[in-house]
């Protein structure tokens, strides 16, 4: 029997943005010494008039539409999707989110616009302490229901994999509750969820003036939650207003002992060596990066650490310090884009809008931001079989009614999704 007759599902008459090096994708071809690299690169790794064969939830074959048409009679109609010349990308990946939380902080948003500053809001029990309080008070069913709405908003725009952090519990009971909700969201909606332990996010009120004592607790909770199957990676907030590199290093040492990958909120407000620390531990990603310097970029390039850029926070905070995009290009550091969905500084549940912000605010190209929401986002989560349309990769795909891939970053407020495939099944 011919191999082209044995797929579980086939997609025909499609244009593909593969983001695969096998099809010429190379974001940084223009930054390489070889002139031929740029000449050989294909924007988006695109293939036109193509077809895909899917078997056992994986991409099993990619070829020309004309190659598969003689075999269509071997398939039932429900096994065939005619893309009608529209574009297919890898399913989008939101690689930095805080979507599991309780409460709402729109009152603080309003207060700031009436002139209140951070200190005023904090004095009234607002800020992150407000979210911690609401998250602790919510039971697991309430927390799931609130968080599910945010997840589904992202899925409706083509997101098939998502990272979800803890970090609004700041005690063992609530950190566990948050991570359980994250797992449950993935299970219910058949979407890949990468969980990240972020207890080193802020200092809880009960540990005021006892930062080192709290970090000791963070280190003790990690093996417990990992043993319960709740932790895929470890994160921290490394800033003058949060935790020092030495304190984060203590957490990273525990992560290393458990063979857990690390990442870090780095260089958002200042530079205290956070990205250099991530690189020292061969971390998956360093995130925010407005104050990143070239020496640390070189270290990230050596450690293959992804730069995760978060324009939603930049926008919400009205920041003016741009991340060093040109230097990241120069040293060929992969750049990812994410919503950073959180209640305080980026209440954003649109990865498409984050991509547009990456172009408009950070001067990234449409190809860079779409790569940043697919292949580079997958790298930022250590997901080797996601983020590309390539034989052997997971069949997580998004079908779009667009004329060219750049439309996804160009349009605002219009969702051109036509179909979402997760693990080989349309939803």
UniProtKB/Swiss-Prot annotation:
Record's keyword terms, sorted: Cytoplasm, Histidine metabolism, Hydrolase, Iron, Metal-binding, Zinc
Subcellular location: Cytoplasm
Residues reported in the UniProt entry to bind 4-imidazolone-5-propanoate: 105, 168, 201, 268, 345
Pathway the protein acts in: Amino-acid degradation; L-histidine degradation into L-glutamate; N-formimidoyl-L-glutamate from L-histidine: step 3/3
Gene: hutI
Binding locations of Zn(2+): 96, 98, 265, 340
An example molecular function term from Gene Ontology annotations: iron ion binding
Alphabetical list of Gene3D superfamilies matching this protein: Metal-dependent hydrolases, Urease, subunit C, domain 1
NCBIfam families from the UniProt entry: hutI
Cofactor: Zn(2+); Fe(3+)
A cellular component term, taken from the record's GO annotations: cytoplasm
Catalysed reaction, written as an equation: 4-imidazolone-5-propanoate + H2O = N-formimidoyl-L-glutamate
Gene Ontology process terms (BP): L-histidine catabolic process to glutamate and formamide; L-histidine catabolic process to glutamate and formate
E.C. no: 3.5.2.7
Its biological purpose: Catalyzes the hydrolytic cleavage of the carbon-nitrogen bond in imidazolone-5-propanoate to yield N-formimidoyl-L-glutamate. It is the third step in the universal histidine degradation pathway.
Cofactor binding notes: Binds 1 zinc or iron ion per subunit.
Binding site for N-formimidoyl-L-glutamate: 168, 342, 344
InterPro entries: Amidohydro-rel, HutI, Metal-dep_hydrolase_composite, Metal_Hydrolase
UniProt-recorded name of the protein: Imidazolonepropionase
Domain of life of the organism encoding this protein: Bacteria
Residues engaged in binding Fe(3+): 96, 98, 265, 340
Coiled-coil regions, chain positions: none
Organism: Psychrobacter cryohalolentis (strain ATCC BAA-1226 / DSM 17306 / VKM B-2378 / K5)
Pfam families found in the cross-reference section: Amidohydro_1
């Amino acid at each position: 029997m011919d191999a082209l007759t044995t797929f579980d599902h086939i997609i025909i008459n499609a244009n593909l943005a593969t983001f695969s090096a096998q099809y010429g994708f190379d974001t940084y071809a223009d930054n390489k010494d070889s002139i031929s690299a740029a000449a050989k690169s294909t924007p988006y790794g695109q293939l036109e008039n193509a077809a895909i064969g899917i078997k056992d939830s994986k991409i099993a074959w990619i070829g020309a539409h004309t190659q598969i048409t003689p075999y269509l009679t071997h398939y039932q109609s429900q096994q065939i999707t005619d893309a009608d010349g529209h574009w297919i990308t890898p399913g989008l990946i939101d690689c930095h989110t805080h979507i599991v939380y309780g409460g709402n902080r729109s009152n603080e948003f309003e207060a700031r616009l009436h002139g209140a500053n951070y200190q005023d809001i904090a004095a009234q029990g607002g800020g992150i302490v407000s979210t911690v309080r609401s998250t602790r008070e919510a039971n697991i069913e309430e927390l799931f229901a609130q968080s599910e709405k945010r997840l589904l908003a992202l899925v409706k725009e083509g997101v098939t994999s998502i990272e979800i952090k803890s970090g609004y519990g700041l005690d063992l009971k609530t950190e566990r509750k948050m991570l359980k909700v994250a797992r449950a969201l993935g299970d219910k909606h058949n979407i890949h969820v990468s969980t990240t332990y972020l207890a080193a996010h802020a200092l809880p009120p009960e540990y005021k003036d006892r930062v080192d004592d709290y970090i000791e607790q963070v280190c003790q909770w990690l093996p417990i939650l990992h043993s319960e199957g709740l932790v895929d990676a470890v994160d921290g907030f490394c800033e003058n207003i949060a935790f020092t590199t030495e304190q984060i290093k203590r957490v990273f040492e525990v992560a290393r002992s458990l063979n857990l990958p690390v990442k870090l909120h780095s260089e958002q407000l200042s530079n205290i060596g956070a990205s250099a620390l991530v690189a020292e531990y061969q971390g998956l990603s360093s995130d925010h990066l407005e104050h990143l310097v070239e020496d640390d970029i070189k270290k990230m390039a050596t450690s293959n650490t992804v730069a995760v850029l978060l324009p939603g926070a930049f926008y919400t905070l009205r920041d003016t310090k741009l991340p060093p995009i040109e230097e990241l290009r120069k040293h060929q550091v992969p750049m990812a884009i994410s919503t950073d969905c959180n209640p305080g500084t980026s209440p954003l549940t649109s990865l498409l809008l984050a991509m547009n912000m990456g172009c408009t605010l950070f001067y990234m190209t449409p190809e860079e931001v779409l790569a940043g929401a697919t292949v580079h986002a997958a790298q930022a989560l250590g997901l080797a079989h996601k983020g590309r349309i390539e034989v052997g990769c997971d069949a997580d795909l998004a079908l779009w009614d667009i004329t060219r891939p750049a439309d996804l970053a160009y349009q605002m407020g219009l969702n051109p999704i036509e179909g979402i495939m997760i693990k080989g099944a349309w939803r």
